[in-house]
């Protein structure tokens, strides 16, 4: 009969590794979050999907899910969530946030243009000279005529045609830079 060598484990010699216990509920929450990330990927257009760094298996699964309906779609999204659990989802999430924020950034730029237009019509020359300092290649005469006609339209309670034209001109001027 062979003798077994007994291994004596000395707990004091080992480095203390901190064990992090994760609850089952937290694991489920993480899985659900990844499943929702998968749903967002499925709802993207082809051009936006190309901007996201996906491996080929995940990309194929997402493209298949875009063609499925109802229960098959639900199962495919579950599968996409499973694939996302196996990889690091941070780069995917960052790329998705960048795509989603692009629309909000565009809206913020348009809102700033509206405020600038209002300032041009209300303040007149002071705001006009500030704009010309920032954008010296602007058509000074055309913009000045638009501002004057917008002020007249406001005084006479006419439809704000020039007001809209100022916005379009500013949009063309500023967003092209």
UniProtKB/Swiss-Prot annotation:
UniProt GO cellular component terms: cytosol
UniProt record similarity statement: Belongs to the DarP family.
Keyword Cell membrane: no
Entry-linked InterPro entries: DarP, DarP_sf
Species, as recorded: Histophilus somni (strain 129Pt)
Family annotation (SUPFAM superfamilies): PSPTO4464-like
Compartments where located: Cytoplasm
Keywords: Cytoplasm, Ribosome biogenesis, RNA-binding, rRNA-binding
Keyword RNA-binding: yes
Pfam families from the UniProt entry: DarP
Job description of the protein: Member of a network of 50S ribosomal subunit biogenesis factors which assembles along the 30S-50S interface, preventing incorrect 23S rRNA structures from forming. Promotes peptidyl transferase center (PTC) maturation.
CDD domains hit by this protein: YjgA-like
NCBIfam families in alphabetical order: PRK05255.1-1 (NF003593)
HAMAP family on file: DarP
GO MF annotations, alphabetized: ribosome binding; rRNA binding
Top-level division of the source organism's lineage: Bacteria
Primary subcellular site in the record, as a coarse category: cytoplasm
One GO term of the biological process aspect: assembly of large subunit precursor of preribosome
Record-given protein name: Dual-action ribosomal maturation protein DarP
